[in-house]
Amino acid sequence: ASGRCLDTPAEPVGSKLCERVRQTSYPVIERSGVLFGWFGAPDKAPPFPAFDCFAAPSTHVFAFKGLWHCNWLQAFEVGIDPAHTSFLHRFLNDAPLAAIGINPAGKQFRSASLGDFGGEQWPMTRVMREFHQPDISFEARPWGLQITTLRSMTPELTHVRVTHGIFPQTFVIPLSPTLTITQMHVPVDDTHTYWFSFFTSFA
């Protein structure tokens, strides 16, 4: 939409007001079921981010949102904390995808697996539950922050997770060899935040 007024029916016949009135408009595009608008100068719009969740076909992305009653920075901080999953997302048992049912959307966390190593299955739920004191390191990157998390599981096996914090509001988490989560935290005001989450499957 260009913002051009098409009609002013309450104006007298012959009025040219509608030709002079314009509503401010902003370009909007849709990606993975979410609308994105650029509110800055039209000639200064940056390239749209080439994240996996926007490049993958819609059949491989599940997106949802929620309204959180907290500041966006609080939401961002808890999401990039690699230790919180061992406590706030702890499952006492593990479930393969086949056991979740016919609609697995949003439940992939429970079925994500590192595979079979040394005759043992290592679903992510087990990794998070049994190894809750990881070694965490941080490195500055041009886009923000890289967080490397190491969970030593056996003398031969270490779980490595690299999270990218893309400032000011996005981070990408690799959940398994075939699944990533991209989260965005959009401030509404000082105490409310819209949280957008994109599960992208490469399977």
Describe every region a protein language model picked out.
Residues 42-203:
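C-terminal catalytic domain of Rieske-type non-heme iron oxygenases
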